[in-house]
Amino acid sequence: RMAGNAVRGSPTWQSRYGSLMQHMFSASNVSCEIVVDGKRRTIFKDVSLAIAPGEIVDLVGPSGSGKSSLLTAFARLNPRAHGDFVLQGHPASAFTPQQWRARIAYLPQKPVLLGDCVADAIRLPYTLAIRQSATQANGRKAKPVELLPDVSIRETLDAIGCADIDLGRAPHDLSGGQAARVSLARTLLTDPKVLLADEVDAGLDDENADKVAAILERAALNGMAVIRIRHRPPDGRATRIMRLADGMLTQIENESRVEISNGGGIA
């Protein structure tokens, strides 16, 4: 899926691109505890992970192992987790929470699309940013449609394989696959450095799941670092597959060793 037929994660890919890779994001000593029935339960402890620009890292593991908790920890959205996080050489303490989340985007499993039409739903981050911004020199604030006109949205959707999605369509009229792709497109338009995709292909058929995966692959080819939770068989797009189980994060060296549970998910 890359130029010269260098498959992601293969020795050829590593030899061609591995020496060029520098960490976009790293996390170390990440731990998470919750309280259940008055007792503390450790979800994971002292987990570490680093990812380079252009990488796709798949995160697999049994249900309840803490995969979503780990991604929300990376996004600084998990108050029960703590650790040391570095983005492009700068510690998390150098960023406000808003600055951090603008650069490290967390995409939840279920799309949340608000607005009268697809275009409005995609412009939502710009709408919120304008509300928080200062008034311009001319005494007015820019309108979301001025910052992100329909033509720009249309170009982006077309470029990532979403030509079938009508900007004027109501979000609640979208199919599950279309809603997932619109949600992903909205996130990509904010241009994050790292994308944390929390099983965004859940509930989709194979065709739509592959469309979502292709969009993530394009983002990675443009330099974005992508971590995606998956409960599907390996699709050859990941540079690495990491397994979270029993509170520990380990790398799966051979894709053929990824276990598929009876329910069809990756264990």
Where are these predicted regions, by residue range?
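The feature captures the beta-strand-to-loop junction immediately N-terminal to the Walker
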Residues: 60-62
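Helix-to-loop junction immediately C-terminal to a conserved catalytic motif
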Residues: 75
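Catalytic Walker B motif of ABC-type/P-loop ATPase nucleotide-binding domains
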Residues: 195-199
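Conserved ABC transporter NBD signature motif
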Residues: 83-91, 100
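Conserved structural motif at the start of ABC-family nucleotide-binding domains
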Residues: 25, 44-46
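Conserved ABC ATPase signature
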Residues: 170-174, 178
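Q-loop/switch helix immediately C-terminal to the Walker
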Residues: 116-147, 152
